[in-house]
Swiss-Prot record:
Pfam family, one: SET_assoc
Coiled-coil parts of chain: none
Biological role stated in the UniProt entry: Catalytic component of the COMPASS (Set1C) complex that specifically mono-, di- and trimethylates histone H3 to form H3K4me1/2/3. Binds RNAs which might negatively affect its histone methyltransferase activity. COMPASS recognizes ubiquitinated H2B on one face of the nucleosome which stimulates the methylation of H3 on the opposing face.
Low complexity: compositionally biased ranges: 7-18, 105-121
A GO BP annotation: methylation
Upper classification of the organism: Eukaryota, Fungi, Dikarya, Ascomycota, Pezizomycotina
Annotated Polar residues bias: 70-80, 130-158, 174-186, 843-855
Name the record gives this protein: Histone-lysine N-methyltransferase, H3 lysine-4 specific
The protein's assembly and partners: Component of the Set1C/COMPASS complex.
Region (Disordered) location: 1-205, 400-458, 555-607, 667-792, 842-908, 932-982
EC annotation from Swiss-Prot or TrEMBL: 2.1.1.354
Provenance organism: Neurospora crassa (strain ATCC 24698 / 74-OR23-1A / CBS 708.71 / DSM 1257 / FGSC 987)
Keyword flag S-adenosyl-L-methionine: yes
Keyword entries, A-Z: Chromatin regulator, Chromosome, Methyltransferase, Nucleus, S-adenosyl-L-methionine, Transferase
Amino acid sequence: MSRSSGASFAQFFPAAPRAARDRATERERARMRAQASPPTQPLDTNGHRTPLSSFTSNRSDDGASPGRSHITSLNHSSSAGADATRPPLEDTESLPGDTLNTVGSASSHTSTSSSIFSSSTRQPAMASASVRNSHTHNSTTPLTTAGSPSSLYLSTSLHAKPHSVSPHHADKQNGLTPTLNGSATDSLVPLPDGTERVPPRDPSRSVLCTICTYDPLLDKKLSSSEKKKAKPIYKDYGLNDEDDAPPSDPRLAHGGKLSYINVNFHLPKAQLIDAPSNLKPYPYDPKTSCGPGPPVQILVRGFNPLIAFTKVTTIFASFGDIAESSNKMHPETGSYLGFATIRYKDSKPTSSRPVPVPAHQAARRAVRGMHGRRIEANQVRVEFDPEGRKSKALMEAVLKKSRETSQTPNAAYKIPTGPKPRAGEVIPGPPPTAPKGPAAHRALGGSEAGWTSTKPRHPNIIETEPIVNHIKSEPYIFVAHEYVPVMPTTVAHMKKRLKQYGFDDIRADRTGYYIIFRDSHYGRDEASKCYNSANDTAFFTYSMVMDLHLFGTVGKSSRSSEDHRRHSYGSEKRPPPEHRQRDDQDRRRRDEEADIEEEKKQRAKNLDPVKEAAEVIRREMTEHLLKTIRTKITLPAVFDYLNPVNHAAKRRKLNIDDSHSGTIPSIVFDDSEGRSSPVGTPNSRADPIERRTARADVSTLRVRKLKSRGVNARKHGFNDPFARARPTQRVDLRSLHHRLNSDSDDDSDDGVDNRYSMIRDTEEPESRPRSRVSSEEDRNKEETGSWVAGEDDSMTEASFALNDTSALLKKRKLDLPAETAVKRQKKAEELFEATIARIETELPSQEQAVESVTPTGVEAPLNGLPDADVKAEPAEDKETEDSRLPTPIPDNTKPKKKAKAKKKSKKQIFEEREALKKQQQETFEREALRAAGIEDIEGTPDAEAKSQVGEPEPVPEPELETKGEALEAPETESKPDLDPELYPSEVVDALVLPKDFNLDIGTLKLVPFHGEDGPDAQRLQRKFGTAKLDCDAELWLWRRNRIRQLNSEDGSVDKPVGIGGYYVPNPTGCARTEGVKKILNSEKSKYLPHHIKVKKAREEREKNAKNGNTNSVAAAAEAARLAADSLVAKGNSRANRVNNRRYVAEINDQRKNFGQDSDVLRFNQLKKRKKPVKFARSAIHNWGLYAMENINKDDMIIEYVGEEVRQQIAELREARYLKSGIGSSYLFRIDDNTVIDATKKGGIARFINHSCMPNCTAKIIKVEGSKRIVIYALRDIAQNEELTYDYKFEREIGSTDRIPCLCGTAACKGFLN
C-alpha cells in the first residue's frame, strides 16, 4: 500500500501531544461551523456528507485508524482529494480508540465509545453482511460497506421489492465491477430495493436514564446532620444532542497543563497503560456461580520417572488433601513417562491445618508454589489440567513417537548384508559336520555365503588372503575353523576373552583365527601361558582347540603336526575322535539341559499350590521328626549307655582300673629313666597356644618331662612341663598372665596329684585379689634383681623353641593328710588376707630326706656370718624351688630369696628334724643356715605390712616352724655352750598348736612368741613403705569385731564374715578358660541380696505349708511387720509435706479447669512430681524398678513411655527382636490397633517386672486426645521395694512355648501365659 506524498508527522503519529492539541482545536472550529450552517445532506457518524447517488469505501490517508471507513463517491478524482485534505468534523475522528466500533473493528476494550451506538450500528451491519451477494439491486440501489453506517440514513420513501436476479446479472445492469479498491470488494453489500430502514435514533427524543449530578453523602464539606437534610440532584439523560456524542477522552483534560504522557509516575519504572484495567473477577461460589468452576486438577511433568512417586505426592500433599493421583505409564511397555495428574479435594480442618483449604485453592497454591521448582535434580512444570486434556495430549504424543520409532528401524543397529558373490564364484563354507553358529548368523538362503560384517566401515575383518603367508618368526596360536566358526563378531569376543594375555593382534581368515604375539622372549612366554590356560576350553558353545607355534613359520620346529591345515582353505578332514566324542558329550548335555528346562516349564505350568504346600510341610515334618528322634531319643540313650557310672560293676568284674571314672583323673608323671606318661590328649602335639586357649579340661593336658641332659644346663628359670629343647636364648620376657596363676607351675612340678593341685590352683587366684598377686610379684622382683634371659613363660609360643638342658629330678607325691593341711592353710589365708609362714608340702622318705638335705653345689659363705644372705639348699629342693619361684636368681653363687615359701605339715617338719639329726655339719654351715632361716622368717609375715599400707583386715602373721629353725637342733649337740632353752638336747616342738586352731587376731594372743619371732620393723618399712590407718587400731579392731558379731548367727566374733559357697573353684583352673556359662539361680541366691530374700521367703512359705501354718507366733510377727511397713509407707517426710503444700494452689486451679477428670489432673501432677524410682538388678528377671521412697496407695508413679506403632508393625518387630537375639521385648498394647514399643526408645518404666501378686497396676488414660499408659500403686509400697504389675498375658494352656514365671510369690501361677 503506497502512501501519499503529503503525509506529515501528525498523520503517522496521531497520539503525539502536539498533534492531539491541534486536532482538538480543529474539532472545536468544525463544531462551531456546523452549528452556524446546518447540513442539507444527512451526516454519518463521522460528520461527513453522505451523497445518496453512489457510494464506495476507501481508506483515508489522513491518519485515521485502519478500522475507520470513509464514504466517498465512485469518482476518485474529485472526492478522494477533497477527503484527503478535509479535517475531521467530530471528536470521534481524533484517535483510533475513539471511533465507533463496527463489525471488523478492534476489541471493545480499546474503545471509549458509548455502548448505545455500538449496539445500534452492529445489528444492521451484520444483517447487511449476511445477505451480501444474495439479493438483487437496480441502478438506484447504492452499494455500502459492512462497516459503514451511512446506509442507515437512506430515505424511508424508497420502497421497492427485490427482484430475483443473480448478483452477477445485477452487477452488469449497474455497470459496476465487483473488484474495487483494496479490500473493499469484500465489504460491498447491496441493499435490497425499497427496504424500510430503521433509523439509529428515535426522532422524538426520550429520556434514556437519570444521572445524579450531586450526591450530598459524598460531599466531604457537609457534616453528618447536613448530609441527612440535603437532597441529591438528578438530571435526565438523552434529551439533548450532546448526549448522543460519546464522552470525551478524560486523558485530554490535562493535555495543556501537564503535557500529558501516557505513563504512570507512581511506579519506579514508567509503565505504559495500553487499556483500562479490567474489573476483578468475582470469587467462585458453588452455590451461586455457574459453569464448571475453577480447576482442581493439575498436571505435573518433568520429574524423574525412576524416583518413587510417593515423594511427588508427599510434596504436593502439603498444599491440600489429594483425592486422586495418577502416575502415567506407557500402555504397552508399562514404564513410567515422567508426568502425572493430581486432583485435590476440599480438606477439613485438622490439628496440623486448622483452616480448611478448598480444592481449587489447593490446586492454585500448588501451581504457584511448585511451577519451575526442582524435585530432586529435575525441574518440574505444574499447570492446570481440569479435564485431563493436556495429559491426554502428552500420552498421545508419546504413543505417536513410540510408533514412529518402532516403524522406522534404526540404521545404527541394522545388520548390513555382506557383498554378494560374483556369478560362478563358489564361496567355501564349513563342512556339514561342523557345529552350527548362532541362529542370528546362520545363512537364510541355504547356499548363501557364511559370514557377514557387523559394521560397514570394517568390511575386511575376515581377510581373503591366507594370513600364514605373512607370518614369519612371530609366535602365534592357531584356532581352526572346525572348532570355532569364522565370523566377524567372534574376533571382538575372542579379544575380550584373551585380554589378560599380551597378544598383539587377533586376525582371521577362512581357515581360522591367528592370535599373534610379539617376536620376543616375553611374547613367547605369553603365547605359552595362553596356550596352557585357554587350550581346549569353552568358548560360547564351542571348544577352543589351539595350535601353538612359538617361532612362526620360518623359525624352529613348532609343536604342531598339522601345519597343512593352515595352507588349505577348506579342509575336509574330520576332527579327531577325542574331540568328536567331547562334542557328542556336550551336545547330549545341552539336550538334557533343554529337556530339564522344558520339564521345569511344564511343572510350573501345571503347578498345584496346595499339593506343593503339602509336600513342603511333609518334608519339613520329616526333617523335624528325624531331628527330634536324634536329639531327644538317640543321643540321651547313647550318653546314658556310655556313662562310666553304669559300667562300674563290669569294670570291677574285669579288674579294670576305675581311675578314669571320676571327673578329674590324676596325672601320673614319669620318672627320669624316660618312661612315658600314660596320660595324654588326643591332639597332644598340637599348637601349645591353641591348647592353651581352647576349652580343655585339666585332665586332658599332658605333662611331659625331659631327660636329664645336665643339671647346670638351665640353672635359673622355670621347669616348664611343656617345654621342648631350646637351641637359642631369648629376649628377657615375661607375660602378665603368669601373675594371675603363679602357683600352678609349683604344684605341677612338685609332682602333686592333679586332683588336689587343680583345687589348690583354682582356690588361690579366686581368693586373692589380682592387685595383691601383682604387687607381690613386683616386690619380689625388686629384691632379687632384674630378670635373666633364662626365665620364660611356659605358655608363650617362643618358649617352646628355646633350648632347655636342665634335667628334672624325681617328683614326689603328697599324701592326703599333707594336702589337707595345705588346703586348710590356704583357706585361712583367704579369710584373713595374710600369708602364713612356710610349711613345706613335700613328704620325703628316709632315703630322699638324706639326699634332700645334702648341700651340693653351694659355696660356703665367708667368715660364717650369721646375718649373711646366703642359704644352703639341697640339690633337689633347689631345682624344684627354682621352678616354683616367681623370679629367678640373678647370680649362680647367690641363692635367691623366696618370695613365697612352701608350706609344710608338722609331720614333714618332724621327719626333717630326724634327718638333720643324722647329718653332722660344720658349725659355720649351721650358723649360716640358721641365719638364712631367720631372715626367711622375717620376710614371711605380711600381715603387719598389710596393716601399715591400709589393708581392710591387717592381721599380724605368726611364725610356725621353718627349716631354718629345724637346723638349729643339732647345734646343741655340737656346741654345749649354747643356750639350752634355744637349743635343747632333745627335739621338741617349738610351737604346739591345737587341732582346731584358727588363725585370727584373737587367737594370736594365745600363741607364745619369742623375742626373735617378731618382725623387723625397719626392714618392713624399707620394703613396703609407711601408711596410716584412718582411725585408731583399737577402734578398727572394735569395728571389725562388731561387724562379725552382727553378721554371725550366734554373735561370735571368731568366725569371719563370709558367704558359704561363694568362692567356687573353676574346673580348668582359670576363669578365662571357662568361656561363657550361665550362673544358676541357686548360686545367685548365695550372694545377691534380692535372690537371698526371695529364697528365704520361699523356704519360709514351704516350711509353713509343711507345718500347716501352726506357728501363730511367726504369723503374728509377720502381720506386725506388714503393719509397720504400711505405717512407714503412709508417713511422709517433712520435706515431702512442704513440696505437697507448694502445689496446692496450682492443683486447685487445675481442678477448676478440668472439672471431674481426676486422671488428667493426676497426670499433670505427675509431670511435676515424679516419684523417685531407680532400676537395678532384680531377683525376678534381669533388671527391675525400685521405689526410692515410700509410695501411698493409688498414687500415680510413672508413665510407660515408648514408640507408638501399629499392630502390624509391632508383630514384625517382635519377630525381628526374637531373631536378632534381643529376647526381651517391651511391647505394651493400648488398644487393638496401637502398641507402645519401648524396646529401643522408651523410659525406665519398661523395667517393671511381672508378678502374680503385684503392688502396682497399669491404667490407660486419655490426656489431650491421646491415650497414655500410667502405673498406679495398688497398695502402700515401702522404700527399696521392687515395683511389679501383672502383665495379663492370655492363658495358653497346652502350648509348647509358655513363658515361666519367676516372681516367686505364694500365688505364683507358674507361667506368664
